Every structure is written in C-alpha cells, then in structure tokens.
Amino acid sequence: MPLTMVKSGEINEIKKVGGKEETRRFLENLGFVKGSIVTVISEIGGNMIVSIKESRVAINKDMANKIIV
C-alpha cells in the first residue's frame, strides 16, 4: 500500500520506491530505500512528516504515493 494510507504512529518497511528515475534518486538520497523502516509522525492534507534513518523528513502527497510499504 502507498505510504499515504499509513496512519500516524505506524511503523512500516519500505517494499518499493516508484516513479521516474529522478524522483526515485531524490527519495533514495533522503533514505527511502527498499528495506528501510519508516514511521509516520504526522499527516496533514496528504502531506507527511516521517521518521526515517533517525531523521524527520517532510514529503508531499505525490512523493508519499510513490513509496510502497
């Protein structure tokens, strides 16, 4: 399921990162790689703040939809 469907506080493992090559590379540089653990901190209007690799990252709804957990 896409990251946008995850509720706040849930911990999930990333199964796949989709999108164009440029988008995938951008997300990988932020730490969104297959097998990484991601926790949703908060979600407002589809935009999310997530915890990944001991960092908090804000991503928009379009980016979050490309991350499959």
Where are these regions (language model features)?
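Compact, glycine-rich, soluble single-domain proteins
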Residues: M1-V69
